[in-house]
């Protein structure tokens, strides 16, 4: 197979686009801010296809299973993994921010902060509750779930649909085959959309640098640096340890999903890579049914980067405003976040809304303190989204192995770069899910 020129690689194209976006934002900020529609448009194109892809993947995965017991086992193991790892992430964030104390010495009076820009986040945060979150999983209408692009609602309906289709046996086979064909079409659409990924990454990065400026980061740089280093160490040590214990290298895995990571870096949303992650994890040897359950569910229940951010940001606000936080307050914060963090979907800005909800729920911390980190939240969202993406990928491999639904030979070949670059479904008609 002839190797394509390096400049045709999506990885290289997105990397160059991000670099150009940063340069434009730094030297021509007004022009860069006008590039925002390119980034927004790309994210909207991706989100357009997410709901049908989740539906097709989950339905064909569940309906094609030999036994429904496998679905329950997969879901249970996934939730167990999510709860343990996200709790570890919350604790790590809490420990690091207490040791480094990036907010100490700022002596900010919450009453002097401009809260006008955080009013919408605070209002959205106050509406967050565990009961509302659980009730929101059930869609008011099926059409509404797809129209709004609510991942958990689409997943809920997809599981029910797949279960019902499985019960029909051979009578439901025509429906199963039709949905499988629709799945191939949807992944083809994603392949087409991904051709404009460099433009989307350029627009999003240019806007970010142009709107906020690199210079504005200096004052709060200690928190950002602390957060970025913590995320890197979490990926390499915690996720790396989990990966090593399950027979694969975290560095090779990161290299395997490098294109998806760059797309996320450009858009600041791990959701923008969701369709390709589903495809990539299947190619890696994970069973389709496991991928269909773990990846979408992980976008609400396994956001490791967001978990680290939430504890660090909350305690940073306390330190900066000289709000005392003893061990009881910090344990309360941790318990609140164990619940609240599950509502942080993988979209830009959701982590900030959950942080607002947490400050409101704890009551001890000034919600006005959100204004302190509003300016740098956009820059920290890259590290959150990247960590979330790697975390969900590792979770998929681990749960697949636990459920004995992992082809370990394929896993090692793909991570070593020896796998077939085309889709695992070699019988897909022309235009199938080939690698971009």
Curated annotation (Swiss-Prot):
Its main location: membrane. It is a multi-pass membrane protein. Residues 414-436 are annotated as: Disordered. Keywords: Cell inner membrane, Cell membrane, Membrane, Symport, Transmembrane, Transmembrane helix, Transport. Disulfide bonds: none annotated. The keyword Amino-acid biosynthesis does not apply. It comes from the Bacteria. Disruption phenotype: Inactivation of the gene causes a growth defect in minimal media supplemented with succinate, fumarate or malate. The dctA-dctPQM double mutant shows no growth on malate and fumarate and residual growth on succinate. Coiled coil: none annotated. The DctPQM carrier is more efficient than the DctA carrier for the utilization of succinate at micromolar concentrations, whereas DctA is the major transporter at millimolar concentrations. HAMAP family: C4_dicarb_transport. Belongs to the dicarboxylate/amino acid:cation symporter (DAACS) (TC 2.A.23) family. This is C4-dicarboxylate transport protein 2. It comes from Pseudomonas aeruginosa (strain ATCC 15692 / DSM 22644 / CIP 104116 / JCM 14847 / LMG 12228 / 1C / PRS 101 / PAO1).
């Amino acid at each position: 197979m002839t190797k394509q020129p390096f400049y045709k690689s999506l990885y290289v194209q997105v990397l160059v686009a991000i670099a150009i976006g940063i340069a434009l934002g730094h030297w021509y900020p007004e022009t860069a801010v006008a590039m925002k529609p390119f980034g927004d448009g790309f994210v909207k194109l991706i989100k357009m296809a997410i709901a049908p892809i989740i539906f097709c993947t989950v339905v064909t995965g569940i309906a094609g299973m030999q036994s429904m017991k496998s679905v329950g086992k997969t879901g249970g193991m996934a939730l167990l993994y999510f709860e343990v790892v996200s709790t570890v992430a919350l604790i790590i964030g809490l420990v690091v921010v207490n040791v480094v104390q990036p907010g100490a010495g700022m002596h900010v009076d919450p009453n002097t902060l401009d809260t006008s820009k955080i009013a919408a986040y605070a209002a959205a945060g106050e509406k967050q509750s565990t009961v509302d979150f659980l009730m929101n999983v059930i869609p008011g209408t099926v059409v509404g779930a797809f129209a709004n692009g609510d991942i958990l609602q689409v997943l809920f309906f997809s599981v029910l649909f797949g279960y019902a289709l499985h019960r029909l046996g051979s009578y439901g086979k025509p429906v199963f085959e039709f949905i499988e064909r629709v799945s191939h079409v949807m992944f083809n659409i994603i392949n087409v959309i991904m051709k404009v990924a460099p433009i989307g990454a350029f627009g999003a990065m240019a806007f970010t640098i142009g709107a906020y400026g690199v210079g504005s980061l200096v004052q709060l740089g200690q928190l950002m640096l602390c957060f970025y280093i913590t995320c890197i160490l979490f990926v390499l040590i915690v996720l790396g340890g989990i990966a090593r214990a399950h027979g694969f290298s975290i560095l090779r895995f990161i290299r395997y999903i490098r294109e998806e990571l760059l797309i996320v870096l450009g858009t600041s949303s791990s959701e923008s890579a969701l369709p390709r992650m589903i495809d990539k994890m299947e190619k890696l040897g994970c069973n389709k049914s496991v991928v269909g359950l773990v990846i979408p569910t992980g976008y609400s229940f396994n956001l490791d980067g967001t978990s680290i951010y939430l504890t660090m940001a909350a305690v940073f606000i306390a330190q900066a405003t000289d709000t005392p936080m003893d061990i009881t307050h910090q344990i309360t914060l941790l318990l609140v976040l164990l619940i609240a963090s599950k509502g942080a979907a993988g979209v830009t800005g959701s982590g900030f809304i959950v942080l607002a909800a947490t400050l409101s729920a704890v009551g001890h911390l000034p919600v006005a303190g959100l204004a302190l980190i509003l300016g740098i939240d956009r820059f920290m969202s890259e590290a959150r989204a990247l960590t979330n993406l790697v975390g969900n990928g590792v979770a998929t491999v681990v749960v697949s192995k636990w459920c004995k639904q992992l082809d370990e030979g394929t896993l090692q070949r793909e991570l070593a770069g020896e796998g077939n670059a085309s889709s695992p479904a070699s019988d897909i008609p022309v235009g199938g899910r080939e690698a971009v």
